[in-house]
Swiss-Prot record:
This is Probable chemoreceptor glutamine deamidase CheD. One of its GO terms (biological process) is chemotaxis. Probably deamidates glutamine residues to glutamate on methyl-accepting chemotaxis receptors (MCPs), playing an important role in chemotaxis. The gene is cheD. The keyword Hydrolase applies. The keyword Hydrolase applies. It comes from Vibrio cholerae serotype O1 (strain ATCC 39541 / Classical Ogawa 395 / O395). Gene3D superfamilies: 3.30.1330.200. Belongs to the CheD family. GO terms for molecular function: protein-glutamine glutaminase activity. Its EC number is 3.5.1.44. Coiled coil: none annotated.
Amino acid sequence: MLVVAVRFSIIWDILFMSDSKLATKRKLKQEEAKGQYYRFNHPSDHRHWVKVMPGGVYATSDQEIIHTGLGSCVSACAWDIEMKVGGMNHFLLPFNNQFESQHWHPQALLSDSSRYGCYAMEVLINRLLSMGAERERLKFKLFGGAHLMGYQSLVGEKNVEFVLEYAKREKLNVVAQDLGGAQPRKLLFDPQAGQAWVKRIGFSSAHAIKQDEELYQHSIDKQIPSDDVELFQ
């Protein structure tokens, strides 16, 4: 298992910034009204920063930094180095209860949970393809799926099982991953260069992440959106 390391002091400083400090820099725009992401100017970086919220997906050809916080959820970072486009999603599998999560398995392709996960992955991939990326050139880095206490521990485990099985089945070029474990993460991604930085954080600093994911989990409608999505076999 490959783990992405943080090597630049500015990245460390940013990762340790509290969500309350970052919140003062939030500048919502009209296209962000759905709440999937928001963009702001970082005080010590010349680029725009975009935070992807649970259930969101964001792809860009601009020089930006995409970031998110991950508890039980997983994120796939994908990019085409030649076209200089990249993006990130942030999702979890929807389960109605602990019994359902215990009996789900990655090969249950027709289950609502698997279909939701496939949709989250295909939205990211198709969005990059629409921006000129070639599927054969796409590279992926996978993050998240922490085994948190209680019911959420099963959710994190199942999210990891799903994303690994999906990557294997669809023959995705996964070049790095940092999955599982017992701690939430903060994740930064440069979509043009394909560089990613991850910092595991303590539970005392992860209240906002946990709250966002709980709200997302309660709001998930397991009816897959009607938009046509191509599943690559």
